[in-house]
Amino acid sequence: MAIRKYKPTTPGRRQSSVSGFDELTRSTPEKSLLRPLHKTGGRNVHGHITTRHKGGGHKRQYRLIDFRRNDKDGVPAKVAHIEYDPNRTANIALLHYFDGEKRYIIAPRNLKQGTVVESGANADIKVGNNLPLRNIPTGTTIHAVELKPGGGAKLARSAGSSIQLLGKEGKYAILRMPSTEIRRVDARCRATVGEVGNADQINIRWGKAGRMRWKGVRPTVRGVVMNPVDHPHGGGEGKSSGGRHPVSPWGQPEGRTRKPNRPSDGLIVRRRRSNKNKKR
């Protein structure tokens, strides 16, 4: 995917870049696979803000994505189109199954229009094919990996992400995650061969605040510029730095937001590298 840069005709356009959309083959989605998507503005049923920095944005329709693919084992499908999806960073591929059904999947890198893909334990090791981890050779690059058998893909679904299958150990497969974490996953879980396409999406420069508003992202205001009634860092004379360790608006220390005792933590072989230990 190429990145298209604008001429600097305005201050916002000077910094902007957009996707070239070279991979896409159709601009209109499959109507039968669309569902309405209602905006919440980050509010719950009582109208209280539960997620900050959400609201507005362009109207969207949700594309139904098949994250399981386990009920189509042995049924080949032809890639009819590669399409844009406003609800995710990756592109999506429209499959026409030979039994007449149509479904969307996450579009892997180098998946072309007209390619035939399939799912099942006996599927070939080919980009776009979906099969259990125990049937995939060690060293293969995969994406859209399940955490529980039949639970649907949960891992490596965003643009450019991938997981490497390092080996197999009893009833588990050993995976290297995009975060560099190494963990065990039930070998009956399914994965799709290849890495997610649209990898250059990370290099897009939004250029101006308005483009983020189109996406439904509202501004993030720093606590130190608020009043004391609004944030623990607020108040002070002049540009004060807060005078305490960083906390949330409700006084919780920043960082360490992950639950420390998840049941699946016992399957982690090696923790992810912290930022200070990552190679530059």
From Swiss-Prot:
Region (Disordered): 1-59, 223-280
Basic and acidic residues compositional bias, start-end: 23-33
Biological-process GO terms, alphabetical: cytoplasmic translation
Keywords: Ribonucleoprotein, Ribosomal protein, RNA-binding, rRNA-binding
Keyword Transmembrane in annotation: no
GO CC term, one of those recorded: large ribosomal subunit
Domain of life: Bacteria
Gene Ontology molecular function: rRNA binding; structural constituent of ribosome; transferase activity
SUPFAM superfamilies in UniProt: Nucleic acid-binding proteins, Translation proteins SH3-like domain
InterPro entries, A to Z: NA-bd_OB-fold, Rib_uL2_dom2, Ribosomal_uL2, Ribosomal_uL2_bac/org-type, Ribosomal_uL2_C, Ribosomal_uL2_CS, Ribosomal_uL2_dom3, Ribosomal_uL2_RNA-bd_dom
Composition skew (Basic residues), residue ranges: 36-59, 269-280
Family: Belongs to the universal ribosomal protein uL2 family.
Protein purpose: One of the primary rRNA binding proteins. Required for association of the 30S and 50S subunits to form the 70S ribosome, for tRNA binding and peptide bond formation. It has been suggested to have peptidyltransferase activity; this is somewhat controversial. Makes several contacts with the 16S rRNA in the 70S ribosome.
Subunit structure: Part of the 50S ribosomal subunit. Forms a bridge to the 30S subunit in the 70S ribosome.
The name this protein goes by in its record: Large ribosomal subunit protein uL2
Organism name: Corynebacterium kroppenstedtii (strain DSM 44385 / JCM 11950 / CIP 105744 / CCUG 35717)
